[in-house]
Design a protein with these regions (language model features):
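Double-stranded beta-helix
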Residues: 2-9, 81-117
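Short beta-strand segments
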Residues: 36, 62-64, 106
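Glycine- and acidic-residue-biased ligand/ion/polar-headgroup-sensing regions
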Residues: 43-56, 60-61
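A generic "binding-loop/recognition-motif" signal
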Residues: 32-34, 43-44, 62, 78-79, ...
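A short glycine-rich, His/Asp/Glu-containing loop-to-beta-strand
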Residues: 2-40, 44-45
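Short acidic-glycine-tyrosine-enriched beta hairpin
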Residues: 61-79
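Short beta-strand His + acidic residue motifs that chelate non-heme Fe in jelly-roll/DSBH
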Residues: 37-38, 57-58, 74, 80-87, ...
């Protein structure tokens, strides 16, 4: 099996665990009290399962609490972000992307705590 690199980000890190022509799977870890940018993708949809922890998920105009075992569908073109609400524990997410392109340049950021817009 292929060993994939860990990619560090200001909010945590991710590791790609599977990649094919139309599917990419990642494990994402969000550090306590950190959040991903508010973003959308033009060329992929995402399916998330919360493996460990809890957070607040924004999809479109709605925000809701998510916790272990929760499933989130993010349609192509839909703005989204997740925040780890824990003071001390990581938020771990399994992410499956379906689409035609998985490059990091298909992340269109709207808001970002780390000045990456």
């Amino acid at each position: 099996m292929h060993s994939f690199e860990i990619f560090n980000r200001p909010w945590g890190f991710y590791k790609t665990v599977f990649l094919s022509e139309f599917v990419q799977a990642k494990i994402i870890q969000v550090f306590p009290k950190q959040q991903l940018s508010l973003q959308y993708h033009k060329k992929r949809e995402e399916h998330w399962v919360i493996i460990k922890g809890q957070g607040m998920m924004t999809i479109g105009e709605s925000t809701r609490e998510v916790m272990e075992g929760g499933y989130i569908f993010i349609p192509k073109g839909c703005k989204h972000r997740i925040k780890n609400t824990s003071e001390k524990n990581p938020l771990i997410i399994s992410e499956v992307q379906l689409g035609t392109y998985f490059g990091e340049d298909d992340i269109i950021r709207i808001e970002d705590d780390y000045n990456r817009v």
